[in-house]
Amino acid sequence: LMEHAADPDTLVHEWAESVIGDQYPVPDRILHFTELIVQDYLAQEMCDRRPPKGTFDLFATEGGTAAMCYVFDSLQENFLLNQGDSIALMIPVFTPYIEIPELRRYQFDVTEISADQMTPDGLHTWQYKDEDIDKLKNPQIKALFITNPSNPPSYALSKETTERIINIVKNDNPNLMIITDDVYGTFIPHFRSLMAELPHNTLCVYSFSKYFGATGWRTAVIALHEDNIYDKMIARLSEEQKAILNKRYSSLDLHPEKMKFIDRMVADSRQIALNHTAGLSLPQQMQMSLFSAFALLDKEDRYKAKMQEIIHRRLHALWDNTGFTLVEDPLRAGYYSEIDMLVWAKKFYGDDFVAYLQKTYNPLDVVFRLANETSLVLLNGGGFAGPKWSVRCLLYTSPSPRDVEESR
């Protein structure tokens, strides 16, 4: 904060009020010093310490799930996405990204882009084919929703796929809105979000829950570059649509037409009328500041290295007993592991057994039998629009034998 020439008295006043929690958040979008700290944190963790020019405006939210709700709501309220519009969804993906577009309010026409690339020996790479990414060239597709690294495969976009998306935006679909959920980015060495590569098109949702093991704190931010296509597209709406929006936000600003999209999200999150009580609670913002400051002061990234080492240790503890060789992949976060049971069945028992398995059993039989007989709870990958016979294993909360031994 001293690098930002912060006034010490003003800083201490904000922090003292945040600890006490005696006020509504002012500014409502995010507290002043919280925004400065989190901006630096995102530049370090989401942009690999090489942020694009300009500033990202932040909106502090009650976890990533609230951020998702606010994004979908405000995109529609501001006519950026209308009922029945075409969007693209990169799958497998966190289930609500599948279910929300299906709601009657939205009923979006969804183009699924599946991470179905395979190695020559039949293993999943969880990356995307060029011809599928090229679907984004269609200007009818207004928005792309992505979780990066993915959930549940837990892989980051390859450099080739990222560059292909960049070229498509620059040459074919310049108004493509990209909504990226990057909660697992800190588990990838030198991770760079699409917010770093395509800042004008990308709206980033980042939650502190996974990296800091603090899901119960409900701390997240929506990040949107100060120079973005969302504001520009609102400015190009029809006169009728502008009139509707001006009336909607007229109680908040003498010139509602000048309101930024991210500020409209804040107001929308409280049905406009309760905008004066909007924002994440002061204690939650204080905790968010502490998380960010902790990472920023860890100049050698010791915490990050330890978290990544724990994940990889557990990943190998899982896979070393499967009969498969887990090839090292710098794009693998490892927070989850998605295991395709049909790949296993084919490798060890052949095609005839695969056919028998599919004919005789249901994919859910695997997870229910594991739960009943071993008390091991996994999720079926089909619910994430992944392979029907895959299962998702959560490694971050699944201690390896070494973890148990070290805890004694």
Protein language model annotation of sequence segments:
Residues Q287, F294, D301-W319, L326-V354:
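Conserved glycine-rich beta-strand-loop-beta hairpin in the small C-terminal domain of fold type I
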Residues E328-Y335, I339, Y356-R392:
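Conserved PLP cofactor-binding pocket of PLP-dependent enzymes
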Residues Y396-D403:
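Conserved small/polar residues in nucleotide/adenosyl-binding loops
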Residues M195-K260:
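Active-site PLP attachment segment
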Residues A243-I310, L315-L318:
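Structural motif of enzymes handling amino- and sulfur-group chemistry
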Residues E3-H4, G21-V26, M118-Q127, P153-K159, ...:
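Short, flexible/disordered intra-domain loops and linkers
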Residues A5-N173, G185-P199, L203:
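Conserved core of the PLP fold type I
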